Regions:
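Conserved beta-strand positions in repeat-built beta-propeller and related beta-rich domains
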Residues: 59-63, 114-118, 169-173, 224-228, ...
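Gly/Pro-rich loop segments of beta-rich domains
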Residues: 30-48, 74-101, 131-156, 186-211, ...
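Beta-strand-rich domains and repeat architectures in extracellular enzymes and scaffolds
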Residues: 39-65
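A short loop-to-beta-strand structural motif that recurs across blades of beta-propeller domains
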Residues: 65-69, 120-124, 131, 175-179, ...
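Bacterial N-terminal signal peptides that target proteins for export
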Residues: 2-14
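Hydrophobic core register within WD40 beta-propeller blades
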Residues: 50, 105, 160, 215, ...
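Bacterial N-terminal signal peptides
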Residues: 12-22
Length: 347
């Protein structure tokens, strides 16, 4: 499967979007916005990126070009930033901000970092103030350049993860992994050869990817769903060496020893440090890789079109993901594999 910038519109149409992991701050009490209402209030339209803290699940409602929050107690949905159906790239407060198909998200403190995919840049949303600023990349200018802040360029970034000191971005259109140091917003390509596809392992000058659309990080490694290559890759943080840890490189649906397992359009991934959870989109399943035993199993099957995004609760007991057929957010018990609907309530 070839997955590169030219196929991005197909990705959006099929529902293969990414979601991201985070932890942070409370949800909001904000009126529903006209144009996003159903009979019972606001709704999601093609939910993409997810981030979760102890009080809310944040959802990038991609077709609405808005960032929303689901209160974990009341299950109510509110709009945090963006104006429904109004795409753009403006920074600003709340509904004065504009996005263009926002996707993956992660939280550091009270700041939500967002892959604003079709603007090819990275945005920061301060949750208490609802203030949106562009921290890296330049809207509507795709490129491969490293540099500080808006001097750098991305090409359809999809998912983002953090270790608290840096942001790690799956720069899908460039088939590269980028790091943004939070202290100075310096952007550096740490794996992959930006603008070139391949499947090579090795250090940052040799490794190659093909449209990576999932990324997660723990204390020792960065994990990447190398979607176009149908494999899961691991980047050692200390050496920046890339290796393949799961998948044969052929489309399939096979559990077992990690390097014998097969995937079909793996998207978002997240980790608690002991297991890696993989949204295997075209197999309609959530897969679990035991990072000690190096085995892959199915955690659960999904009836609808599984969104390519996930987020773990802080205790690792619940895995959140989106369903782009039902425009819903689902919850999987990571022990039993049982699935319930978080939003819409009663879904």
């Amino acid at each position: 499967m070839t997955l590169f910038a030219s196929s991005w519109k197909w990705i959006l149409a099929s529902g293969a979007l990414l979601l991201a992991l985070g932890a942070g701050a409370p949800a909001f009490a904000q009126p529903a916005i006209s144009g996003m209402q159903s009979q019972t209030g606001p709704r999601l339209d093609f939910p993409a990126g997810l981030a979760v803290d102890g009080r809310a699940v944040y959802v990038s409602s991609s077709r609405n070009n808005a960032i929303t929050a689901i209160d974990l107690t009341s299950k109510s949905l509110t709009v945090v930033a963006g104006t429904i159906f109004q795409q753009g790239s403006n920074d600003g407060i709340g509904d004065a901000a504009r996005f263009n198909s926002p996707d993956g998200m992660t939280i550091v403190g009270q700041d939500l970092y967002i892959c604003d995919t079709n603007n090819s840049d990275i945005r920061k949303l301060n949750i208490p103030s609802r203030t949106v600023t562009t921290i890296a990349g330049t809207a509507n200018i795709a490129g491969t350049e490293d540099g500080h802040g808006t001097a750098a360029h991305f090409n359809l970034p999809t998912q983002i993860a953090t270790d608290g000191q840096a942001l790690y971005v799956a720069d899908s259109g460039n088939s590269a992994i980028r790091r943004i140091t939070l202290a100075d917003m310096n952007v550096k390509t740490i794996a992959g050869q930006a603008g070139t596809t391949g499947k090579t392992e090795g250090n940052m000058t040799k490794s190659m990817f093909n449209g990576p659309r999932g990324i997660a990080v723990d204390k020792k490694a960065i994990y990447v769903a190398d979607t176009g290559n149908e494999v899961i890759r691991r980047i050692d943080i200390s050496t920046m060496e890339t290796s393949t840890i799961a998948g044969t490189g052929e489309e399939g649906d096979k559990d077992g020893p990690a390097k014998e397992a097969q995937f079909n359009n793996p998207g978002a991934i997240c980790t608690d440090g002991t297991a890696l959870y993989i949204l295997d989109a075209d197999n309609h399943s959530v897969r679990k890789m035991d990072l000690t035993a190096n085995t892959v199993t199915k955690l659960t099957l999904v009836n609808g079109h599984i969104g390519s995004g996930c987020a773990l609760s802080s205790d690792g007991k619940q895995l959140y993901f989106s369903d782009t057929t039902e425009n819903s957010v689902e919850v999987v018990d990571t022990s039993s594999g049982n699935v319930t609907t978080l939003y819409p309530p009663g879904g």
